Amino acid sequence: MSHEPTDAELKQLIDRWIAQWNEPEAERRRRLIREVWSEDGHQVLVNPPEGIRDTAAAYGLPFPAVEVRGHDAMYQRVTRAYEMFVASGEFVFEQEGEVIRHAGAAVALTWVMRSRRDGSVAGSGLEVLAFDADGRVRSDHEYVA
């Protein structure tokens, strides 16, 4: 069973979803992940970086989707992204544009990784989120540009 959030619930959830990627305090980041994600929630990076694709192809493997599942794995994923992009103070993740609702308690949102120095966009992505009965993210399919 899925939960279709109200507009207020959706705004709060998306704000916390973005906040987890920018949160400098490890325990607060872990708490945000538990609030945002269902216990068995998963994120699938649909279009992994070229290096991952090339390595898989070299072994004769099909194009791999990269997936993390559960709070502990998600904490590692979010923490690594924070360390790589945000911790230095160079970038911040922000929602860009409007959230688009889809039938069946799913939404799509666009985010950007913005330079704190000059405001330019250094990266972006599209997330398609589906929710569990408690209104937490059950699945996230991420497309990174």
Range-by-range predicted roles:
Residues 1-145:
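C-terminal and inter-domain tail/linker signature
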